[in-house]
Curated annotation (Swiss-Prot):
Coiled coil: none annotated. This is Adenylosuccinate synthetase. It is found in: Cytoplasm. Homodimer.
Length: 337
């Protein structure tokens, strides 16, 4: 029995979807539970060459044997959820989905408020998905809960009970974090942050799991960190530099071009300390050095690639156990014992 949390180590878009999908296939958890803010965070999952952009359904959906859960702490947009369940019909998502009956519900008024608020949309760079305004209503105790919405009633359940029962039965459980640690309302570059905390402890609370039940925390870092929206970015490079390195990316939810920077070891160390990270996953090593593309054995990585991994381990103080060298699940180096 292992309970693992996957957390973003930067400003989101670290490639958590790829790492989560890999862990769900390799470790075969019986339940995959999503924590985080809500549908403001997008993940791209590639299965057999086909890409799926999702915002509500857990990223581990390709594992057709696992239950898929959205915790009570996660805001739910019924319209987005139902669209994704339909899009993922061939994965039998609808039969495996559990939405906690206590989750907060995003309505049209929240999305309209988010988009029309000049401070949020222009100064902060909000995604416009209604999460911030919905969390305001939640704090005021006026927000609807899942149990109040008929359209999703067939998917409702008690996620905390499901997860804890799975752990007590000796099953593996994977908790998906969203966005990134540096976007945390508490620990990020306020006010250029999201509307709640985005660290491992909060993700555990989102799905109703106590801290002593957590065995592993995997912090995911991209070789070239990126950021969407406003706010500080200490190692940011120019657009020209990013293009010369072939690093041009766009956000899954907003479609906005991502800002790109160099790896920041000091910030990575702070993030690992904040989350109690037990291991690190590095993604897009093939972007850092194209000679690493598709390599699946550590010893066959280029010297440049190995040096990058070694420097991360030495400066951050946490072992790198997973290395992504391409978009496919098979393009992963796994050095876990």
């Amino acid at each position: 029995m292992t309970c693992t949390i996957v957390v973003g180590g930067q400003w989101g878009d670290e490639g958590k979807g790829k790492i989560i999908s890999y862990l769900c296939k390799k470790d075969n958890p019986s339940i995959i539970a999503r924590g985080g803010v809500g549908p403001n965070a997008g993940h791209t999952v590639e299965v057999d060459g086909e890409k799926y952009g999702i915002r509500m359904v857990p990223t581990g959906f390709p594992n057709v044997n696992a239950k898929l859960a959205v915790g009570a702490g996660v805001l739910t947009d019924p319209e987005v959820l139902l669209k994704e369940i339909k899009m993922l019909e061939k994965f039998n998502v609808g039969e495996r989905m559990i939405i906690d009956y206590r989750c907060g519900i995003i309505e049209d008024v929240h999305k309209e408020t988010d988009k029309s608020n000049e401070h949020l949309s222009k100064e902060i760079g909000s995604t416009g998905t209604g999460c911030g305004p919905a969390n305001v209503d939640r704090a005021m105790r006026t927000l609807k809960q899942g149990k109040d919405v008929e359209s999703i009633s067939k998917y409702l359940g008690d996620v905390s009970e499901e997860v804890n029962e799975a752990l007590e039965s000796g099953d593996n459980v994977l908790i998906e974090g969203t966005q990134g640690s540096l976007l945390s309302l508490f620990y990020g570059s306020y006010p250029y942050v999201t509307s709640k905390d985005t660290n491992a402890a909060s993700f555990a609370a989102d799905v109703g799991v106590g801290p002593t039940k957590i065995d592993e925390v995997v912090a995911v870092f991209k070789s070239y960190p990126t950021r969407v929206g406003e706010g500080p970015f200490p190692t940011e490079m120019t657009v020209e530099e990013a293009e010369s390195l072939g690093v041009v990316e766009y956000g899954t939810v907003t479609g906005r071009r991502r800002r790109v920077g160099y790896f920041d070891h000091d910030l990575a160390k702070k993030v690992c300390r904040l989350n109690g990270a037990t291991q690190i996953a590095i993604t897009c090593l093939d972007k850092y050095d194209t000679d690493c593309y598709g390599i699946i054995e550590y010893d066959k990585l280029s010297e440049k690639g190995k040096a990058f991994i070694k420097e991360v381990e030495e400066k951050v103080g946490v072992k790198v156990t997973l290395i992504s060298t391409g978009p496919e699940l098979g393009q992963t180096i796994d050095v876990r014992k």
